[in-house]
Amino acid sequence: MKTLLLTLVVVTIVCLDLGYTRRCFITPDVRSERCPPGQEVCYTKTWCDGFCGSRGKRVDLGCAATCPTPKKKGIDIICCSKDNCNTFPKWP
């Protein structure tokens, strides 16, 4: 009986995702990946560099523990808290 209970406990632990982590799109590959433990916020950061006029804004996608704050003017950061919510921006 103890063996059966132990087996059920092990199967339950293996089947349940006890350490759920957020999934976000990550650059440069723009693919969905699990975020490291403790990072439950997805973000999209956009900014202009020297090629902004011809190529458009640069984009950085990733995970964070809290929503990052821009360190310079001209950097836009959008945060969200659902799986894969930080899709690559669609430009007009």
UniProtKB/Swiss-Prot annotation:
The keyword Amino-acid biosynthesis does not apply. It holds the Pfam family Toxin_cobra-type. SUPFAM superfamilies: Snake toxin-like. GO terms for cellular component: extracellular region. Keywords: Acetylcholine receptor inhibiting toxin, Disulfide bond, Ion channel impairing toxin, Neurotoxin, Postsynaptic neurotoxin, Secreted, Signal, Toxin. Residues 1-21 form the signal peptide. Its main location: secreted. Belongs to the three-finger toxin family. Long-chain subfamily. Type II alpha-neurotoxin sub-subfamily. This is Long neurotoxin 3FTx-Oxy1.
